[in-house]
Amino acid sequence: MFLEEYDVIVVGAGHAGCEAAAASANLGCSTLLVTMSLQNIAQMSCNPAMGGIAKGQIVREIDALGGYSGIVSDNTAIQFKMLNKSKGPAMWSPRVQSDRMRFAEEWRLMLEGTPNLDFYQEMVSGMVIENNKVLGIKTSLGLTIRGKSVVLTNGTFLNGLIHIGDKQFGGGRAGESAAYGITEDLVKAGFESGRMKTGTPPRVDGRSLDYSKMNVEAGDINPSKFSYSDVTKPLVHQRDCHMTYTSLLVHDILREGFERSPMFNGRIKSLGPRYCPSIEDKINRFADKDRHQLFVEPEGWNTCEVYVNGFSTSLPEDIQFKALRSVVGFEKVKFFRAGYAIEYDYFPPTQLKHTLETKLISGLYFAGQINGTTGYEEAASQGLMAGINAALKVKEKEPLILKRDEAYIGVLIDDLITKGTEEPYRMFTSRAEFRTLLRQDNADFRLTPMSNTLGLASDARLRRMEHKLNESEKMVAFFKETSITPTEANPVLIAKKTAEVNQTDKIFKILSRPQIDLSDVLKFENVANYVANNNVDQEILEQAEIQVKYSGYIDKERANAEKLTRLEDLKIPEKFDYHQIKSMSIEAKQKLSKIRPVTISQASRISGVSPSDISVLLVFLGR
């Protein structure tokens, strides 16, 4: 029925579980993916979209590391947008609207085509743990399946409790059972657990909406894609989304249900995602606002089901329906299903190492919402890293730990491990101090070489990345070496209302001006000839432009990152006794003793540990 013992067992087949299973199997480990329903692999439980601000960077990093999310997202996209294009490239974030059903189907097809990967459908009810080491899992039918390592990616299923108005019932997602037993086993083993909350909006019948009353939200005219590989192509055709607004009337109707709202009557005590509040939370917290945006998002190419982005709610169904019917364009709306809130168990992530292995139990890894994060992309990236590190541990190889200056994934995991979280954590560009280095356009430069060394990213991917890097560097060198005369440069400079040049100048210097962009220098004959003669594509041109315009910022961040690296190299002994340092604050001693940072750099990022505490620690360690 099963192998006698698997190298890696992955529990849960959401975004984290799928990436974990794929990574482990692709690294040559015998892998078992266990889920409560094989029909629900890689479900988009909430919005039908991938990417977005900072999240798009994460999807590109997953792809650069050899994960599947970028390819699946490209192959099932119905619309593409590059967000924040009006800002600098450090802020550009790709996002796709997805075909929900095709997304899950594509994930399953890719997993079924992955060697070394087995599947099993059943609820996992507990862990097999001996002498602080995981040995496998127990199922609800009483089976024991042995594994050298286990990755838990349970999403919202651990003791999940769904709320709609004054109704509540167990469930991990609408129409699916919650998972029981795992939390209890882990708490018994010494883990600390907590509760979090998230929510989702109603789904409605698009045939009942009047789109003529809404604003059209179209995709990019020249769409890009997530994957750096050549196995996917940018969209040729796209579906529009739409935008409408709530109103004071809608807000008044929603307030009618507050006394029956689990958020306001005390039934829900857990904290929800700060940056994705429910509609009732928005009108309560921002009572001065007359309206809130609602994005009307199709769920696929061939379905009339629509996701009402911005209307997450746990209010009673009748209030949800009445309020939506008062929204412009929704006057005749028909419901497919009501919105709801869900509470679930999580485990404070300060109990993990940077590999996502638990400190308490050897061979046990956590990834996704079990660690207190929210979002498909955050979950998928953790799953990928947990799957990689579980496989590397089995093979007795060094783990893969991404630093804060190497990837948003590194920032995410470091934040979780060193700071913890008491509310659902989502990634933002503002969380990354080296975001100019961590752009969406260069994730392949940053991560594909190390992934290729591991055996995840193929040689073909590496060659493609090296070609892009070499050609963009040649283009930058051309800009630095090639001069332009005032006769040719000034007409362009005048048109852009920037100072003329009085003598021959380098194209690099001209392009460095904020008023000048790539389309301007392409008007210069020598640039146009270089591009034509060398078949320079748009991706390489954009990469070269970024390197020119932001070279100063990039150099400054690299210098700061090198300083951080020096602190990362200063190790703290594993069992160091912080209580012996009398001049360190009590709070710092407590936090450091609990989190057990591996390096001085990690210690400095822990909340409650001051610079003076770090100075004392450095002196004590003789550094």
Swiss-Prot record:
Principal location listed in the UniProt entry: cytoplasm
GO BP terms: tRNA methylation; tRNA wobble uridine modification
Chain segments annotated as transmembrane: none
Keyword list, A-Z: Cytoplasm, FAD, Flavoprotein, NAD, tRNA processing
Cofactor: FAD
Cellular component aspect of the GO annotation: cytosol
Organism domain of life: Bacteria
Positions annotated to bind NAD(+): 272-286
Residues involved in FAD binding: 12-17
Oligomer and partners: Homodimer. Heterotetramer of two MnmE and two MnmG subunits.
The protein's name: tRNA uridine 5-carboxymethylaminomethyl modification enzyme MnmG
Organism: Flavobacterium psychrophilum (strain ATCC 49511 / DSM 21280 / CIP 103535 / JIP02/86)
Name of encoding gene: mnmG
